[in-house]
């Protein structure tokens, strides 16, 4: 995980929802919503993770 006061560098799709668009872009939260809402209905959604905008900004610095 991250140190106190820092934000995470990556988030698993099952941790994401549409409220996370500002942290991980648009497509990743959609995949998170699909995993959360459709996996139990038998829809196969591959698990994965998203790098955060915080991680991207650290990389640029």
Curated annotation (Swiss-Prot):
EC number: 2.7.9.2
Pathway: Carbohydrate biosynthesis; gluconeogenesis
One Gene Ontology term of the molecular function aspect: metal ion binding
Reactions catalysed: pyruvate + ATP + H2O = phosphoenolpyruvate + AMP + phosphate + 2 H(+)
UniProt keyword terms in alphabetical order: ATP-binding, Kinase, Magnesium, Metal-binding, Nucleotide-binding, Phosphoprotein, Transferase
Statement: the UniProt record of this protein carries the keyword Nuclease: no
Keyword Kinase: yes
PANTHER family found in the cross-reference section: PHOSPHOENOLPYRUVATE SYNTHASE
Function: Catalyzes the phosphorylation of pyruvate to phosphoenolpyruvate.
Domain note: The N-terminal domain contains the ATP/Pi binding site, the central domain the pyrophosphate/phosphate carrier histidine, and the C-terminal domain the pyruvate binding site.
UniProt record similarity statement: Belongs to the PEP-utilizing enzyme family.
Record's miscellaneous remark: The reaction takes place in three steps, mediated by a phosphocarrier histidine residue located on the surface of the central domain. The two first partial reactions are catalyzed at an active site located on the N-terminal domain, and the third partial reaction is catalyzed at an active site located on the C-terminal domain. For catalytic turnover, the central domain swivels from the concave surface of the N-terminal domain to that of the C-terminal domain.
Protein name: Phosphoenolpyruvate synthase
Species the sequence originates in: Enterobacter agglomerans (Erwinia herbicola)
